[in-house]
Amino acid sequence: MFCSRSLFASTAISLTMMANAAYADLTAAQVWGDWKSYMEGMGYTVTATEAANGDTLAVSGVSVEIDGGPDIEKMRIGMGAVELVGNSNGTVDVVMPDVMPIIVEIDPKSTDKPAKFELAYTQSGQKMTVSGDPAAMAYDYEADTFSLALTSVLVDGTVM
């Protein structure tokens, strides 16, 4: 489970990065491209459905997959949809649902059983704004509350 803890930590860090705002022109596509590059740079394969409408980029069906190392064949993480909204001041707002489902699937290499974890990333009063320039993005994140709850565990198809 070491790989999954590392993945959760890297995902949480990327979702909640704090920095001072620096204003320059960014687009929603540049922010999404930065997220994809970051994850791909860590060895993940990233897939998603992208739909642009004006200054808004809706990203849904987000899935990241990685070879898991010596004990895990593959690990896949699926996440809910986000919208990246370009603002007139050159910043981009990241709009997430109040509850974002996260599904982690692990296929072992050994005789261990496959596992599936379902989580709910819940937040209220969330606001995330990305500023800066494409080479140096800064994230300003705030939320009244947020939590990550384990909602189900299946091992070899059996609810635990």
Language-model regions, residue ranges each:
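Glycine-rich, small/hydroxylated-residue low-complexity segments
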Residues: 25-160
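Gram-negative bacterial Sec-dependent N-terminal signal peptides
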Residues: 1-24
